[in-house]
């Protein structure tokens, strides 16, 4: 365990929550001058932190605790009937690892995804600068997992490879390929990849009970939720 007590953290001013607009959110950030050390990152992930661009953060809201860190314990996971169908439906997909970079192919896919799936969110409208700042960081543990069929790019899972697991940073995919359930397939693939690498978990970020867009996370069972500084398993 790293000496986390020596790290400095800063809190933002309260602002409107992007998930629950009726709530005021505060975010706790690791000191940006702190080098992005992979072991520090792993230890903070176990405490509910996430990465966005060059920053490690977690919610630190005074009057709300709706954002619950979630992870999938890889060795315990068993796909259900629907998930097995998704795996079978995508058996033709080839996955390869790439270094994070800006390419027109990546951005075009990202742009279609944001415009068709998240036009009501704070990432709309998408821009090249936003894409690069958010996802294209020169970090040794960051990967762009490309999902392709006959060289056609269908999805990119931006994933951090940590000593204790895979952290699913962000996934964007072809919005017209609804039948494939590419977002769910990407998570299933990451679970299998974490198992292959003999890692402990896949970190999914935050689950919010009253946010429809987050409901998919609890469809992967068992799932572990960080509650009162302790990971609790739900079967």
From Swiss-Prot:
Compartments where found: Cytoplasm
Keyword Acyltransferase: yes
GO cellular component: a single term: cytoplasm
Root EC class: transferase
Record key words, sorted: Acyltransferase, Cytoplasm, Transferase
Disulphide bridges: none
Pfam short name (any one): ATE_N
Single Gene Ontology BP annotation: ubiquitin-dependent protein catabolic process via the N-end rule pathway
UniProt catalytic activity: N-terminal L-glutamyl-[protein] + L-leucyl-tRNA(Leu) = N-terminal L-leucyl-L-glutamyl-[protein] + tRNA(Leu) + H(+); N-terminal L-aspartyl-[protein] + L-leucyl-tRNA(Leu) = N-terminal L-leucyl-L-aspartyl-[protein] + tRNA(Leu) + H(+)
Protein task: Functions in the N-end rule pathway of protein degradation where it conjugates Leu from its aminoacyl-tRNA to the N-termini of proteins containing an N-terminal aspartate or glutamate.
Family of the protein in this entry: Belongs to the R-transferase family. Bpt subfamily.
Protein's recorded name: Aspartate/glutamate leucyltransferase
């Amino acid at each position: 365990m790293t000496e986390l007590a020596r790290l400095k953290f800063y809190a933002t001013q309260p602002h409107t929550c992007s998930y629950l607009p009726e709530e005021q959110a505060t975010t706790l950030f690791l000191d940006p001058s702190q080098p992005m050390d992979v072991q520090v990152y792993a230890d903070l992930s176990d405490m509910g932190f996430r990465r966005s661009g060059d920053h490690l953060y977690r919610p630190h809201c005074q009057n709300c605790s709706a954002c619950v860190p979630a992870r999938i314990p890889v060795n315990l996971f068993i796909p259900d009937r629907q998930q097995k169908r998704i795996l079978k439906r995508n058996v033709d997909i080839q996955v390869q690892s790439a270094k994070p970079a800006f390419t027109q192919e990546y951005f075009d896919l990202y742009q279609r995804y944001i415009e068709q799936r998240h036009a009501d969110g704070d990432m709309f409208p998408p821009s090249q600068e936003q894409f690069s700042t958010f996802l294209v960081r020169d970090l040794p543990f960051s990967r762009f997992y490309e999902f392709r069929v006959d060289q056609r790019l269908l999805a990119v899972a931006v994933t951090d490879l940590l000593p204790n697991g895979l952290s699913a940073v962000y996934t964007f995919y072809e919005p017209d390929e609804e039948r494939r359930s590419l977002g769910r397939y990407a998570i299933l693939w990451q679970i299998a990849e974490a198992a292959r690498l003999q890692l402990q978990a896949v970190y999914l970020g935050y689950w919010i009970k009253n946010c429809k867009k987050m409901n998919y996370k609890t469809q992967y069972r068992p799932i572990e939720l960080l509650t009162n500084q302790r990971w609790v398993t739900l079967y």
